[in-house]
Amino acid sequence: MKMKFPTHPQLCLVAALAAFLLFAPACAEKPAEKTVPPQAAPPGPAKVVYAGVRSSKYGIKPFPGPAAWEKAIGAMTAYFPGSAPCGIWIVGTMARTPRFAHLEFPSGGKSFPNVEFEEADRHERYLSEFDKAGISVFLQVEPANADMGTLIDLVLGRYKHHRSVIGFGVDVEWNRTSDHPETGMAVDDATARTWEEKVKSHNPAYRLFLKHWDEKWMPPTYRGDIVFVDDSQIFPGMEPMVKEFVESWAPAFYPNLVIFQIGYNSDKPWWSKLPDPPKAIGEAIRKRVRQEIGIIWVDFSLREVLPLGEGQRP
């Protein structure tokens, strides 16, 4: 700040005296500085608690055997020391008729509105192998217009004897999709609570996950024990992806566990240039997120990135 001094002789004398009184204390010996208590350090980088892959019948063909999935999941956990091997395992997809959920196991002779089944079980032998290998899986559905409570009971009622099963997941993009095409119907607080209670009625340790690319489709305030999965794609580069994950998705659900599903072919033009893409992307996310996270690579590009032990890759 600039100061304007007077020019009249008497005023100059007054000004000089005032200046002496103002600045004299500064010339005296400084007292000992007060010790300021150290501030708490900001939260450190996140811990990757789950690392693994997503499985779907449409994402990878031919569909690998159990040993190949185990190998791919093991490669993911090796990138993130201390992480638990995990799979997002899709057991129900939206049927060709968009009001129906297609469950990939037999009906047991029963019928349910907006639900169709397969004659043979696609998943039993995989889950049995995962039990032995110590791999954890969330069983996911694309619900369409089927009743969610019914889907939870059908899926967990069939597979909860497997110790590999740790929860149930809903891809909200396909929730009531015939009425809400392209985005699915958003999940409100009451609905999220009801779904979570239904999942935990099968096992209190089970966790519900909700998946979408936009946090506005998630419950506005209810968090419970829910895991929130982001499957955003079509980014121009890694930094825009990481920025969205760490500045939008993760803080919206802090301190809940968040999982990031990565490796889409739409992002391949830039991730294919990275050394060890799962590790590079996962580490970039981990360093900038406060809560526990999971890193899941999608099956669309699995054979290009992770070893499956199937011999020469196609």
Walk through the language-model features, giving the residues of each:
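Aromatic-lined carbohydrate-recognition surfaces of secreted/lumenal glycan-active proteins
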Residues: 135-149, 196, 200-218, 257-265
